[in-house]
């Protein structure tokens, strides 16, 4: 896997930003003629499918690749991975930082302009954990036509992004759930999902997962049921032995990558030996 740490000037955020991009590349077995037809090239046969992978609170663009084997999983399955640093801004507009615009418009513009990855919705996916799960739902339901599928792991479906950005972590209880439901519909996963339904648009396919020892398990189950009631195609996974933790997310990101409803040529070729 070719791994790039990119630092560039964002025209949305008006400052330099860091992202990590991993791109499938020639493997050691391929370079030694142990797999494939013996020929090697750094020119892809087609543009790679891409997964925009969002981190959780307190993390950054390097956390997913540091705490999981996502590089290995992506290399085996030949899919590009894009990680960014969204601070604790929940991937929405807070103050002068418009991370919603950055993620939805500028990040794909930069990545697709600089790397051999697809712009086609058929080959574009988004996923995230905790705060990143919240961001995934907001972006996927704001622009459902842009993503084939989404993955939300231990998603903070009732997060208050403004309080989070100020260092205030609100209790995820029934009272707070009602408060979230009445918030600005532009940043409420619940309201955005209802809007997709009301406008008659198809939902991206949904992969939803949460550990049963996680304090937000019940809110995840409730949101899963809400999506099903709205007509979304939801795949659900849970594990009795895990809470809000990286060992669970490492398991889930591999399951998610295997689950993706891919139609690209690389998927048809099957998993590679690394």
Residue ranges and their predicted role:
Residues 1-274:
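Non-catalytic cap/lid and distal C-terminal segments of serine-dependent acyl enzymes
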């Amino acid at each position: 896997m070719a791994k790039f740490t990119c630092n560039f000037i964002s025209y949305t955020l008006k400052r330099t930003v860091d992202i990590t991009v991993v791109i499938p590349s020639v493997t050691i077995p391929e370079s030694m003629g142990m797999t494939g037809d013996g020929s090697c090239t750094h020119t892809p046969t087609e543009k790679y499918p891409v997964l925009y992978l969002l981190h959780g609170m307190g993390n950054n663009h390097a956390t997913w690749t540091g705490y999981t084997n996502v590089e290995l999983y992506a290399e085996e399955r030949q899919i590009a991975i894009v990680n960014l640093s969204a601070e604790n801004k929940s991937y929405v507009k807070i103050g002068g930082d418009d991370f919603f615009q950055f993620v939805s418009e500028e990040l794909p513009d930069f990545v697709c302009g600089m790397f051999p990855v697809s712009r086609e919705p058929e080959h574009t996916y988004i996923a995230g954990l905790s705060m990143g799960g919240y961001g995934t739902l907001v972006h996927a339901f704001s622009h459902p036509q842009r993503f084939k599928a989404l993955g939300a792991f231990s998603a903070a479906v009732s997060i208050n992004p403004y309080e989070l950005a100020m260092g205030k972590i609100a209790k995820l209880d029934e009272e707070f759930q009602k408060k979230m439901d009445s918030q600005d519909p532009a940043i409420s996963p619940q309201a955005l999902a209802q809007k997709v339904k009301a406008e008659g648009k198809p939902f991206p396919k949904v992969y939803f997962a949460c550990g049963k020892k996680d304090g937000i398990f019940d809110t995840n189950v409730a949101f899963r049921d809400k999506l099903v009631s709205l007509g979304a195609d939801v795949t659900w996974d849970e594990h009795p032995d895990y809470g809000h933790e990286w060992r669970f997310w490492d398991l889930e990101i591999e399951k998610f990558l295997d689950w993706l409803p891919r139609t690209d040529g690389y998927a048809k070729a099957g998993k590679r030996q690394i």
